[in-house]
Amino acid sequence: MKQSVLDLQATIQETLGDAIVVSDIKLDELTVELAPEQSLSALTKLKEKLGFDQLIDVCGVDYLAFGDVTWETRKATNSGFSRGVFDFAEEDGEADTNIPRRFAVVYHLLSVENNRRVRVKVYPEDTQMPMVDSVVSVWNCADWFEREAFDLFGILFNGHPDLRRILTDYGFVGHPLRKDFPLTGHVEMRYDAEKGRVVYEPVTIENRVNVPRVIRNDVEPKG
């Protein structure tokens, strides 16, 4: 492990103090988790005091069903091999969406002057209406990044100057990168020749599992 990464970890811990929930180094990469109520002030210090002048990315993460495999069941089943094809949410029970630390906002920062990088995570406290402070006032480029996280994950950014959808269609319902959003979606669109316009209708595609999610524990990362 490069000593510079350890030095960076120590410097950030000294600068941010109790704003840090935990910091970790894996594969020579530093990840720092911040308390949500102190995230804006801590991120501001990372830029102004430690020279992280470049915000590379802001993204959302949904940890719903994290670590679960597609065929894992919570009770006995009599559906046999059909579980590998058809949707079995009704049989096995819907996933609990009100889990702690379901959503995370992840920031990737770069210090051009010092040639250092850090990953910062913030977990919103409210999973039903996840919200963190916007960092547009710190890095202007966060504008569209935060709009994308709002659009795809439904994460709210307090203080954002124009928080609206950026990728999905007008009138879109839901947030498509949430784990409980169906892969087939809710509606489909087509051109109706009689009406002379595009119409929206309930989706007709059958929700089924073609490639089950499998988690392998036999391969450990190097480093």
Curated annotation (Swiss-Prot):
The keyword NADP does not apply. Its EC number is 7.1.1.-. Signal peptide: none annotated. It is an enzyme of class 7 (translocase). It catalyses: a quinone + NADH + 5 H(+)(in) = a quinol + NAD(+) + 4 H(+)(out). The keyword Transport applies. It comes from the Bacteria. Its main location: membrane. GO terms for molecular function: NADH dehydrogenase (ubiquinone) activity; NADH:ubiquinone reductase (non-electrogenic) activity; quinone binding. Keywords: Cell inner membrane, Cell membrane, Membrane, NAD, Quinone, Translocase, Transport, Ubiquinone. GO terms for cellular component: plasma membrane. It is found in: Cell inner membrane. It is a peripheral membrane protein. HAMAP family: NDH1_NuoC. PANTHER family: NADH DEHYDROGENASE [UBIQUINONE] IRON-SULFUR PROTEIN 3, MITOCHONDRIAL, NADH DEHYDROGENASE UBIQUINONE IRON-SULFUR PROTEIN 3. NDH-1 is composed of 14 different subunits. Subunits NuoB, C, D, E, F, and G constitute the peripheral sector of the complex. NDH-1 shuttles electrons from NADH, via FMN and iron-sulfur (Fe-S) centers, to quinones in the respiratory chain. The immediate electron acceptor for the enzyme in this species is believed to be ubiquinone. Couples the redox reaction to proton translocation (for every two electrons transferred, four hydrogen ions are translocated across the cytoplasmic membrane), and thus conserves the redox energy in a proton gradient. Belongs to the complex I 30 kDa subunit family. This is NADH-quinone oxidoreductase subunit C. The gene is nuoC.
